[in-house]
Amino acid sequence: SIRRLKDTSFVKALIPKLKDPTYASDVQQTLAAYGPDCFEKYKDAFFDSGKELAVREQIPGIFKLISSDASVQCLMDMMDEPNPTLRYKAIKALNKLKKKEANLDFDLDKIHQFLKKESRAYFKLLSIKMVQRTDIPNNILIIALKEKMDQTQERLFRLAGLLYDQQDIYGAYLALRSSSDDVRAASVEFIDNVMEAEEKKYILSIIDTPDEQEKLDKGMDLFDITEIDYETAMLELLEGNDVWLRACALFSISATCPPSLQHKVDESVSDNNPPLVQETATYVKKRNNNA
């Protein structure tokens, strides 16, 4: 009934309902029915860091229901969001729109820019992973970094799917995850043959060798990334916008770590931090004091 009335006064009350998985799909459909007049409201909610992540990550799902150039443009704008989880949601929604309507106006230059950004983000994560200490309990951080690198790789392939045939690119992505060396090699060869040089260099530099140091060397040449030490790498994570990586980095800080990192633990206990960061910092501070 609300959907039929299209009374925009309900929009403000409906947006918070997106966080409930039971009703998220229905709420998305209702909000989509309001059409372009409310697009700016939805974008504002997406970029509002004061809103719950569970709400923000459902916003792109509204636009994927509306096959229009305006929807594509809004989702393109959302890819500027620094939070990788939210960027993923925007890219995934664009994939859905392209699957439904390939003739929509996708800004290819902007997709190229984001392909480059995601590739650089991968190598930054790799550079941080490569300098992790082995004498402290940091397994959870190393695992988290690897997971984030895998997620970045998926975003890269989803972006590539906006430039090329989505099914072909998805098949190549799945092949890369195969346990068979031959299947993975075939995927690398396919990417090399299908993609233009300007795009494939950002992906091939990641997938064409399993050796992490060799991979990092290629990334450093490609993006002019400089080597960093352990302390600098940790500070980048602790000052970053990825809550999970911040928490994992905090957890790995032992009593033997540099004073600058101990100070970050103290800072992270304050109430103005996300609950996960605050709780982890409180635990680590107590653990290190008892060490």
Language-model features: locations:
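Short inter-helical turns and helix N-cap capping residues of alpha-solenoid HEAT/ARM repeat scaffolds
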Residues: 7, 19-23, 50-52, 82-85, ...
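Structural detector for internal amphipathic alpha-helices that build alpha-solenoid repeat scaffolds
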Residues: 1-5, 13-16, 24-37, 44-47, ...
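Amphipathic alpha-helical scaffolding segments comprising HEAT/armadillo-like alpha-solenoid repeats
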Residues: 5-18, 36-48, 68-80, 99-114, ...
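Extended alpha-helical surfaces
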Residues: 34, 103-104, 108-152, 159-165, ...
